Each structure stands twice: as structure tokens, then as C-alpha cells.
Amino acid sequence: MVRLNVKPTRMELNNLKERLTTAERGHKLLKDKRDELMRRFISLIRENNQLRKEVESYLIDNLKSFAVAKSLKNSQMVEELFSIPSKEIELFVEKENIMSVTVPRMHMNITSQNENSEYSYLSSNSEMDDVFATMNSLIYKLLRLAEVEKTCQLMADEIEKTRRRVNGLEYSIIPNLSETIHYIELKLEEAERANLVRIMKVK
């Protein structure tokens, strides 16, 4: 603890007591914020881990399906199937405030295009159809995964900032204020006793 360099007066004592009350209130609010951020962060980490497992599993299975589908078609036909995009994707990113943390909220608008493209059930096969279907459903999981991972990163940064502020108040500011208040109270008591002794001597 470090005693603050202030004059031991009643005015300073009152000021320090007000500062201590404010610091203790701020400490409680920051601790509550940190705890709530941690609760939400842990929930998001669980969702992130689950989503990542699902996405990786989907991708591995889809690559296997693609290898099988490709083996049943000649290379030129496969190239033609993927040469023209069948869908147009518009990505919208909004901002949301969670406990003073600005996080992204992502939305997609998917529209079909090139309806007359070379892709058809005649030029494709069931394996290739499964590949396309899986990739279409995977887009939403990938978007949510990106959103959750970014949110986790931003919340982790805010948790660390809040933790440092809580520790600063708990281990430095509040103890220093308390120590200084105690010191001033002792000094004022000494001054009162000395003044009382002088009065008694005069009498």
C-alpha cells in the first residue's frame, strides 16, 4: 500500500472518503460486468467449439463425396459444373452492443442465378448433388462460426481490460485510499488530543 501525498485535513479526509466510496462502487460494477462477460464468453466458446467440429466434419465428408462424384464424371464435365456460379450471396454486417462490447451480427441474402446454366440433374449425379446440397447448408454454419469467433475475440479483449481495471481498484487504488484515510484520521486524532491537552493546561 502507498499512502497518498495529501495534507491531513478534514477537507481532504472527506474528499478521500468520497473517492473511496466511488472506487468501491465502481469495483463492484466492474466485477459484475466481468463475471457476466465471462458467463457469456464461456457459452460462446462452447458454441464455437461445437460449430467448428460440425464444419470440419461436414468439410471432410464433403471432400470425400466430391472425390467419389468426380471419379464418376470426366474432368471437363466437372469443371463445367463449377465454372458458373449458381447462387449470388450478399453479406450484411450489423453491430450489436453486448456489455459495452460492439460485436458483429452477420446476415446473408442468397439468390439463385444462372437458371439456364449447364448444371442439371442430367449432367450431374447423386453424389455431386449431395456435394452441392451440403455446401449450401454449410454456408450458414460458416457464417455463424465467423460471427462467433470474432465475438469471442472481442469479448476476450474486453474481459482482459475489465480484469485489469478490477485488479487496479482492488489491489492499488482502494487500499491506497483506505491507508491514506486511516493515516489522516490518526493525525486528526493526535491534533485533537494535543489541542485538548493545551486547553487543559490553560485552565
From Swiss-Prot:
Source organism superkingdom: Bacteria
Keyword Transmembrane helix: no
GO molecular function: ATP binding; proton-transporting ATP synthase activity, rotational mechanism; proton-transporting ATPase activity, rotational mechanism
Keyword Nuclease: no
Keywords annotated in UniProt: ATP synthesis, Hydrogen ion transport, Ion transport, Transport
Database matches in Pfam families: ATP-synt_D
Biological-process GO terms, alphabetical: proton motive force-driven plasma membrane ATP synthesis
Segments traversing the membrane: none
Functional description taken from the UniProt entry: Produces ATP from ADP in the presence of a proton gradient across the membrane.
Identification of the protein by name: V-type ATP synthase subunit D
